Amino acid sequence: MENLEKKIELLKKIREFLILNLEIKKLMQELNVDSDIYEAYEKVTKIVREPNIKLYRQYYDAIKEMFYEEYGKKRKDISWYPKIDYNRCKNCEKCISFCPRGVYDAENGKVVVKYPYSCIVNCNACSIMCCENNAIIFPDEKIPRRN
C-alpha cells in the first residue's frame, strides 16, 4: 500500500507542476520574455519532466486497468483523452514538450496521441498550450464524478 501511496503523491505533484508550468509559460509570453530565456526554461522543464514521463510509460498498461473510485470506472472505460485535428495541427510539438504524462509523441513527422489513457481525466491544459489553431480537441463535456 505504501508504494501505491507514493505513486499517488507523485501524480499529485506532477499535476501541480503541470499547472505551475502553464502559468509560468503564460506569464513569460505576456511579459514578452526574451526567446533565449524561454527556450532555456523549456529545456530545464524537459529535464525535470523526463523521469516522470518514463515512469508513466512503464505503468501505462496498469493505468488503463486502474479503477477510478470518483468515476466508478476503470480508466480504459473513461472516454476522456485528446484527439488531434490534423487540418489545424502545425506539428509545432508544443503538446509533446508540455504534457507531463507523455500522452503525445512524434511519428513520421507528425504529432500523435500515443498514450491516450495516460491523460488526466478532465484535464485539457495541453489544448491551451497548443498552437493558435486549436488543433487539440477534447470531449465537449467533463466526465461527471460519482456522488
Curated annotation (Swiss-Prot):
Domain 4Fe-4S ferredoxin-type, first and last residues per copy: 80-109, 110-141
Molecular functions per Gene Ontology: 4 iron, 4 sulfur cluster binding; metal ion binding; oxidoreductase activity
SUPFAM superfamilies per record: 4Fe-4S ferredoxins
Keyword terms: 4Fe-4S, Electron transport, Iron, Iron-sulfur, Metal-binding, Repeat, Transport
Keyword field contains Membrane: no
Positions contributing to [4Fe-4S] cluster 1 binding: 89, 92, 95, 99
Cofactor requirement: [4Fe-4S] cluster
Transmembrane segments: none
Cofactor note: Binds 2 [4Fe-4S] clusters.
Domain of life: Archaea
Protein residues bound to [4Fe-4S] cluster 2: 119, 123, 126, 130
Pfam families, per the entry: Fer4
Protein's recorded name: Uncharacterized ferredoxin MJ0251
